[in-house]
Amino acid sequence: MTTTPSTTPTVTTVTDPAGRALDSVDALEAGLAEQQYIADRGLATTLFLALKLQKPLLLEGEAGVGKTEIAKTLATMLGTPLIRLQCYEGLDAASAIYEWDYPRQMLYLRTLEVTGAVERERARHDLFSEEFLLKRPLLQAIDAAHDRSPVLLIDEVDRADQELEAFLLELLSDFQVTVPELGTLRAEHVPVVILTSNRTREIHDALKRRCLYFWIDYPTFDKEYRILAAKVPEVPARLARQICAFTQGLREVDLFKPPGMAETLDWARALLALGSRELHDGAVNDSLGVILKYQEDVDQVRGGVAADLIAKATRAAAD
């Protein structure tokens, strides 16, 4: 980190751990696929532009569609640290950016008093040095300790209070944080910033303007099948097609919370654990709690709706 006058932060060339340059959408899409993340062309293009233009990327979509996973996958693919800020109501600057280590500061003062080495100006300077600074995720992301750009995941930003967005604006505009006692701390390596939102509230326009944007929808049948085959390869092909057809059908039912891709993967593993080789009434009704997380949805689907979806899934898998 540096407090020198404003300069353009250095940016590490975007490469994977093997040194291969991710210099095209195709290369990025292939790199994600190697990490078992199946991205459609639109998402891969937007992510490529975010990397190339050094712009934050705001991903919105329903819960469970893979927004958080892409940040984790990207960090693995780039061989760089993942720094995560999990947002929640009441999140403040002390938890998101920094705070002073008050207990250690007091201990330091007492030590100076005991040794008779108290000098007001020296003590004040020492107390408010980086030694006593507790760096939270946003400050960690611009820390000079990184030898390449980390991935900063600001997860579920819509759950945080709007006041947090004001703190984010400075970071996302200039990749810097101002600490009154230390000055302005600037990134030496621009972090790759991914923000996610489930759209429980609208994000302020000023924050959106600083980001590229992409909406991640529920996957199509073909994409869901490819993801399932990559993530849970031990699932027989016929059962995998049935699972995907069933979950696709569930999303057309008027549910409080339709299943996302995460639930599809969990359900596939659950069915394997139950010894199921294909969908049938018993296995489906017994395991609905894996893919549906509200009792009202379970009650609605169990029985007739499940039977209809099983029949449709069986026909779809046979096509």
What are the functions of these language-model segments?
Residues 1-319:
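C-terminal regulatory/interaction module of P-loop NTP-utilizing enzymes
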